[in-house]
Amino acid sequence: MRLSLLLLLPLLGAWAIPGGFGDEASLTATAPELDDEEKFSTHIPTHLRCDACRAVAYQMWQHLTKAEAKLLPLDSGGRRELSESVYTDVLDQSCSQTWQGYGVGEVDQVKRLMGPGLSTGAQPSIMVMIMEGLWPTRLSKTCFHYLGEFGEDQIYEAHQQGRGTLEALLCGGPRGACSEKAPDTRTEL
């Protein structure tokens, strides 16, 4: 039964994280019910913006770190430093990627964006995640938005100070996507 669940879920556009296969208890999981905004809107829904921002920060950090690791010479501080043209290209590539592995799941009855770089604490023994739809396009647009808002230079400087600093730049602050009072830029018609 568990094997058939693992084989069936990818066909439905979702995947599961199984618990221990030696467990005798049965596991059940349901896909999160997405509303029309989550299914069809071209923007990231407000309640998922913090997760999206954190995913973007992680991907930028990951791409820049990999590019720096390819450099041989170290600067006087023992760090590898990318040239402006290289980090500009790397950041553009991080936004242009396919954004595979991201989707929406439900943790404690709360919908969350999930994927690489996004930790939601203790994970249930089985989970269904919806990965199809507009999520890759939305994440790419969000990434390019932050690239335009902060600029490559400021993003690379934050990256050099660490992943937390980069995430704080993009997502923190009083108007950041992860602030308590993040602005809702949409207006009702």
Swiss-Prot record:
GO terms for biological process: integrin activation; positive regulation of cell population proliferation; positive regulation of immunoglobulin production; regulation of B cell proliferation; regulation of cell population proliferation; regulation of insulin receptor signaling pathway. InterPro entries: DUF3456, MZB1. Pfam families: DUF3456. It is found in: Endoplasmic reticulum lumen; Secreted. One of its GO terms (cellular component) is endoplasmic reticulum chaperone complex. PANTHER family: MARGINAL ZONE B- AND B1-CELL-SPECIFIC PROTEIN (PTHR15881:SF2). Belongs to the MZB1 family. This is Marginal zone B- and B1-cell-specific protein. The lineage of its organism: Eukaryota, Metazoa, Chordata, Craniata, Vertebrata.
